[in-house]
Amino acid sequence: MIGKCKAIAHGSTALDYIFREGKLGYRLAFHNLCSREPKAIYEEMKVVSDYNSRCRNKFLRIEIGIAPQDEKKLPVSELMRIAHLFAKRMGLDNHQWVAVTHKDTDNRHIHIIANRISLYRGI
């Protein structure tokens, strides 16, 4: 597996991208979120991120690539576990994040969009 992470300012665009019809595979996790649709998720995250006015790039865009030889061996439950474990090790327990898979390429991958601002207002 290979993970990539970047701080971004355009959380709404990133959420629209990961939920785009034709790309979306499985909805793996919604952490510290009530909403399930991209626009509502963004609004929910924005309420929390607005507490920190100094941070510019308030969202994290994370992609976890699954090795081709492992794709067939990993059921959805294992992909969920991977997403939760990755987020935990990134220190995102007190943050809002959503994880999905994409099916638009030959290689399965997980996308996570996370709020950099925690529920307790820290980064």
Predicted regions and their residues:
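N-terminal nicking endonuclease/strand-transfer module with a His-rich metal-binding environment
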Residues: 1-123
